[in-house]
Amino acid sequence: MYRSTKGASKARRDQINAEIRNLKELLPLAEADKVRLSYLHIMSLACIYTRKGVFFAGGTPLAGPTGLLSAQELEDIVAALPGFLLVFTAEGKLLYLSESVSEHLGHSMVDLVAQGDSIYDIIDPADHLTVRQQLTMPSALDADRLFRCRFNTSKSLRRQSAGNKLVLIRGRFHAHPPGAYWAGNPVFTAFCAPLEPRPRPGPGPGPGPGPASLFLAMFQSRHAKDLALLDISESVLIYLGFERSELLCKSWYGLLHPEDLAHASSQHYRLLAENGDIQAEMVVRLQAKHGGWTWIYCMLYSDGPEGPITANNYPISDTEAWSLRQQLNSENTQAAYVLGTPAVLPSFSENVFSQEHCSNPLFTPALGTPRSASFPRAPELGVISTSEELAQPSKELDFSYLPFPARPEPSLQADLSKDLVCTPPYTPHQPGGCAFLFSLHEPFQTHLPPPSSSLQEQLTPSTVTFSEQLTPSSATFPDPLTSSLQGQLTESSARSFEEQLTPCTSTFPDQLLPSTATFPEPLGSPTHEQLTPPSTAFQAHLNSPSQTFPEQLSPNPTKTYFAQEGCSFLYEKLPPSPSSPGNGDCTLLALAQLRGPLSVDVPLVPEGLLTPEASPVKQSFFHYTEKEQNEIDRLIQQISQLAQGMDRPFSAEAGTGGLEPLGGLEPLNPNLSLSGAGPPVLSLDLKPWKCQELDFLVDPDNLFLEETPVEDIFMDLSTPDPNGEWGSGDPEAEVPGGTLSPCNNLSPEDHSFLEDLATYETAFETGVSTFPYEGFADELHQLQSQVQDSFHEDGSGGEPTF
């Protein structure tokens, strides 16, 4: 092997550079463009042209010696297009990009492809997922696909248009030439039409279709500020079947599908909310003359505060409508989170339909959305004009705070306000509501108590309340089509959504849980705050993930949240935690899924703090009166006398007809005597124990035994044993059949069991806390523990020590 040296490495680099320069000479580019290319750009362009040559070399040759058109004529047609042509594989590798791209994006073809050989290198990163979904969506090869994305533009063009350019792409896949590479990477050919803010006027009466109609099905229209049709192109006859004269001076809303009225009105409001040259997009259904419905993708442009509104209308299929509407909803939601301005925030939450819904010309209303058949014809609803409906969310609506929603009416008929008249399957903007901030399908309202001045003194000025729903990315909801709440706004569903928020009790107003959605910057005006009264006894338990709609809720839930403020209005205004963002980005925080109670219900709050191993505090919670203390001492003496009497065996009469067995035990056998030593088999020491006095729960008069039954017990126990005294006589003779006493002949296992049994605490001792706190008496009343030092001749113990 040859050893590498410095000279040999330099020779190899020179050889590689020479080959790259040879590739540059082979590129079909102008000399001015070749001079500006670097080695990396040359290699990227070489890959693109190589793929292009291989693909077109395997295609079918054109009919005739030169085809239908010459090469120059083809170049002239491509240059005259109101867009540019783009060819790339399913994995995004570029094959061709027309030279006319420089007129629309500001970059020349060489500049764009020099950035990389993939389409993802020349489009906005936010649209990578959209393009990837379109390229991987299964369909027939000859099926057209329509989607929109933003292309990167030059710095000079970005300064003029304030961002990347939005482009509408329509194309299809082609049959691949033979080869393993092309079998897995079909080629997609697309025509890209930039969505110009000012469409190019066409010849003839009315707004002309322009050259774009040669590649994109479209018609143009011009409207007044209320969207009344001022003019429309003649090509509307092809797509809707109406003559131009039939539509002039008519309201554009008269052609809309009822389920798309809310979507169109919200976009119309956005277009009128700001002055200047802005645009709005919508995907709606327009009624054709034959009675059917046609999906239309509309681009609306405003020519200033006094000028008309111009619209480009693109007929699309059901699948394209579903894809575009889903993309619009996603972009509007992201813009609402990041910008937080009224011009960008959608004024209602738009539903995203599936492709199965789009295949049906009439969508099924979503959950909680009133159907057209269920609208009550109440006189108080009336007919609301478009101007009145748009005037309700006025420009004074400021998203630096979250207003308190109005109290709903008790019936569904009263709940359907003016804004809900025309909204299946969407919910229009409600003044004071902000459910659209959290991507919900409908805003709910709940019965909430009026503000309280007592809580205003406890809560900080930046604390307000709102009853809107904050839905985590992990929360699941039942199918709206199978739910029993279909087509209705019910109070139970509203409260079930509200219960998923993390509440705070008013017992500790200065301790707020970190799972509440809070917003950092100070409020613009403290007058917008609305507070909720405290809740004296509150106990909240979060539902499990499977129980999305709980059946029973707390009777009067009161929850406190924080206000939305400023640009980064989704940050927590709590002390920082490991999960809190700190880089200043606008991020939506998901709610913490807690699986336990958020508060502990203390029935009687003691005066001192409940701390582990606390020192004894003032004994003011439980106190015995003098009478109760005397009764306790008397009961202790009676129990001790009863225990002393148990040292003597029961008589036959006492065992059968005297005391009844305690706790369901069977009476003692009169033929069985407990012979042996007087003291018990096991010497057990009494343990000191504490217990919480429960005299406040039970009637004190029923706690003690009457004197007469106790005296009867003592008289029965004092009856002499007919069989003699303890320990007298032969055990064999006393017990019939020669049965030994169970107290003398115990197996080691029985002794071990008795020892374990003696060490167990009673049920009452086990339920009592071992930590002293206020409410426990530090005076312990118990039996005196003293070992018997003398016994009588009969085997009984000494005199009672009480």
Curated annotation (Swiss-Prot):
Residue span of region Basic motif: 1-13
Single GO MF annotation: protein-containing complex binding
Main localisation: nucleus
Every PAC domain range: 280-319
Compositionally biased tracts (Polar residues): 472-495, 502-518, 527-555
Helix-loop-helix motif as annotated region, ranges: 14-53
Coiled coil stretches, renumbered: 5-38, 624-648
Tissue and organ expression note: Specifically expressed in neurons. Expressed in the lateral nucleus of the amygdala (at protein level).
Domain bHLH, first and last residues per copy: 1-53
Domain spans labelled PAS: 70-144, 203-275
Processing and modification events after translation: Ubiquitinated, leading to degradation by the proteosome.
Pfam families: bHLH_NPAS4, PAS_3
One Gene Ontology cellular component: nucleoplasm
Region (Disordered) residue spans: 472-555
Summary of the function given for this chain in its UniProt record: Transcription factor expressed in neurons of the brain that regulates the excitatory-inhibitory balance within neural circuits and is required for contextual memory in the hippocampus. Plays a key role in the structural and functional plasticity of neurons.
Protein name: Neuronal PAS domain-containing protein 4
Source species taxonomy: Eukaryota, Metazoa, Chordata, Craniata, Vertebrata
Gene that encodes it: Npas4
